[in-house]
Regions:
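Topogenic membrane-insertion module of multi-pass membrane proteins
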Residues: 2-60, 64, 68, 155-158
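Small-residue-rich segments of transmembrane alpha-helices in multi-pass membrane proteins
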Residues: 35-40, 161-175, 197, 225-230, ...
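Membrane-embedded alpha-helical segments that form the functional core of polytopic membrane enzymes
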Residues: 38, 50-78, 135-146, 185-207
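Acidic (Asp/Glu-rich) catalytic motifs at the cytosolic membrane interface
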Residues: 67-92, 203-225
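Multi-pass membrane catalytic core of lipid/isoprenoid biosynthesis enzymes
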Residues: 88-129, 221-257, 297, 305
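Intramembrane alpha-helical segments
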Residues: 96-182
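Functional transmembrane core segments of multi-pass inner-membrane proteins
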Residues: 162-213, 231-235
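Extended hydrophobic alpha-helices typical of membrane-associated regions
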Residues: 256-312
């Protein structure tokens, strides 16, 4: 799979073609949108009967999350190109569509508008299940997409926002709309599950910023990794995964005391430790893109094992 994707990126890409849009969507990042919704849905299912479990809002949550992730990728691609942050000769990460000329800026602007509108239309029916207050949550998600690339990531707030918008918001709100009205609260277990999810997904941002730390420092992008340095940056990666896993272990064990479910979760830690060891060996440069791929895989492992453990 990695070879095929590299081949696709290195071969000629026709401007505004299907292949160009496929690459701009960054399919590997979609796991970060799917996992939080899956965790919120799994916990809701474990707390209700099949009859009480609300299935349609779960589908809407999945659709909203995926569309917003694609929208965020388009926005990031567009504004980084405008700012000159994705110069092909300097970029360490995967190639970006606008900077490479695969997609014109005008076409990307239209795509951003269309994605934002579709996401809003998709999320609007959720107010039937969770009330009008969900409108504010949806608007916050849309606002986050724009502010993260344009402002907030330059102030070192990226990690906090990932925990909020890839952990607390999607996990808690998915649970909220999936259960019957009598259960529409935010119990401690849901909040801890959401924090666990946010921390694990943040490992993807941490390794991305760890790779780009020198370029970010030069461009004035003061990420958390730029602030703490290489050594503590690697430790943050390790700790985020460990703390996230411990929180999940607590939720799973207190919910059903399933020893099998709890043991399953160890598999994620093994994968996380392996990625960390490779990360500190490679240290810098484009080789760290391998750790980015490993981390995306680990998030998928975390999500899959978590769902199984919650449902056992």
């Amino acid at each position: 799979m990695e070879f095929l994707q590299l081949t696709m990126q290195n071969s000629a890409v026709t401007t505004n073609s299907f292949r160009a849009w496929y690459l701009a969507m960054r399919p590997k990042t979609l796991v970060s949108a799917i996992v939080p919704v899956a965790l919120g849905a799994a916990y809701a299912f474990s707390q209700t009967s099949i009859e009480q479990f609300q299935k349609l809002p779960i589908l809407l949550c999945f659709a909203f999350a995926i569309i917003m992730q694609i929208d965020a990728n388009f926005i990031n691609d567009y504004f980084d190109c405008l700012k000159g942050n994705d110069k092909p000769e300097e970029r360490l990460g995967p190639k970006r569509a606008c900077s490479e000329g695969w997609i014109t800026l005008a076409a990307m602007r239209r795509a951003i508008v269309i994605c934002t509108i579709i996401a809003a239309i998709t999320g609007l029916p959720l107010i039937v299940y969770g009330g009008y207050k969900l409108i504010f949550a949806g608007l916050a998600c849309i606002l986050f997409c724009f502010l993260y690339t344009t402002k907030l990531s330059y102030w070192g707030l990226g990690d906090l926002l990932v925990i909020l918008f890839f952990g607390l918001t999607p996990v808690c709100l998915t649970y909220y709309v999936a259960v019957p009205p009598a259960l529409q609260t935010f119990p401690l277990e849901v909040i801890l599950l959401a924090l666990a999810c946010g921390l694990v997904i943040d490992t993807l941002l941490i390794v991305n910023n760890y790779r780009d730390r020198d370029n970010d420092r030069k461009s004035g992008k003061i990420t958390l990794i730029v602030r703490v340095g290489e050594r503590w940056g690697a430790r943050l990666y390790l700790l985020a995964g460990i703390i996230g896993e411990l929180l999940l272990f607590y939720v799973v064990y207190t919910q059903n005391e399933s020893k099998i479910g709890s043991m399953l979760l160890i598999l994620y830690l093994l994968a996380h430790f392996y990625a960390y060891e490779k990360m500190i060996q490679l240290r810098q440069g484009r080789e760290l893109n391998k750790i980015l791929n490993l981390t995306a895989r680990n998030i998928f492992i975390f999500g899959t094992l978590s769902v199984f453990a919650l449902l056992l």
